[in-house]
């Protein structure tokens, strides 16, 4: 008796886990890894007895006299101006039609067809038609605006800067996350240390949230399971 109950319990547990696995869709973040970077300390300079030092380590407090202070090293920051506006539309239509008509008659009905047509002249008409009309359309638009300050986490060999950043905003019982990563050309950085997101290569922009409001927008696992099985 107890053995059968335990067996039934195990089967029910496996069924529930299998339903959850079939209906659950994993969420993979666009921006993976750390969203900040710390400056890398340089080696201690070696005094060679000369006034001019041909090679000096990275000096984060160095300020060029005839050049704007722009990010150039790991740990430097710059501001990304989010100006994303994407729209797309698509439409298609198809028409097809086909008509057919056939007419034939018998002056003398064959003997084996007299039971069907009689002895008089018989005329047979046949006609058919087929028609199909189909239309489809899709429209999509996306607008994202704002600012986000990011950190340089990698300096590429060609001088471009790979940047990452994250902003968290807590509102009531929910938290909004804005994450960004991409490759910035230092020539596109303005004097105010900003660069538009439209000039960032390999941009990854992610805007997600958690809390009860976000959970209310998600479909339950059981409902998602039946939605996956439904043929409609």
Swiss-Prot record:
Coiled-coil segments: none
Database matches in Pfam families: FlgH (PF02107)
Organism domain of life: Bacteria
Family according to the record: Belongs to the FlgH family.
Keywords from the named record: Bacterial flagellum, Cell outer membrane, Lipoprotein, Membrane, Palmitate, Signal
Gene Ontology MF, one: cytoskeletal motor activity
Residues linked to a lipid group, N-palmitoyl cysteine type: 22
HAMAP family: FlgH (MF_00415)
Record's protein name: Flagellar L-ring protein
Location in the cell: Cell outer membrane; Bacterial flagellum basal body
Biological processes annotated in GO: bacterial-type flagellum-dependent cell motility
Role of this protein: Assembles around the rod to form the L-ring and probably protects the motor/basal body from shearing forces during rotation.
Lipid modification (S-diacylglycerol cysteine), residues: 22
């Amino acid at each position: 008796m107890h053995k059968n109950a335990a067996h039934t319990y195990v089967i029910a547990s496996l069924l529930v886990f299998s339903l959850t696995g079939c209906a659950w869709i994993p969420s993979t973040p666009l921006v993976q890894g750390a969203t900040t970077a710390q400056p890398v300390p340089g080696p201690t300079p070696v005094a060679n007895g000369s006034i001019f030092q041909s090679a000096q380590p990275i000096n984060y407090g160095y300020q060029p006299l005839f050049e704007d202070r722009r990010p150039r090293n790991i740990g430097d920051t710059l501001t990304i101006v989010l100006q994303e506006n994407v729209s797309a539309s698509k439409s298609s239509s198809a028409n097809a039609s086909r008509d057919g008509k056939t007419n034939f008659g018998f002056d003398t009905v064959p003997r084996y067809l007299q039971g069907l047509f009689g002895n008089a002249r018989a005329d047979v008409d046949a006609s058919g038609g087929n028609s199909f009309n189909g239309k489809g359309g899709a429209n999509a638009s996306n607008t994202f605006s704002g600012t986000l300050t990011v950190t340089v986490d990698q300096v590429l060999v060609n001088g471009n800067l790979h940047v990452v950043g994250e902003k968290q905003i807590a509102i009531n019982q929910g938290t909004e996350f804005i994450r960004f990563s991409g490759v910035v050309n230092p020539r596109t950085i303005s004097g105010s240390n900003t660069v538009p997101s439209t000039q960032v290569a390999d941009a990854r922009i992610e805007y997600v949230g958690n809390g009860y409001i976000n959970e209310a927008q998600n479909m339950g696992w059981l409902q998602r399971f039946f939605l996956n099985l439904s043929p409609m």
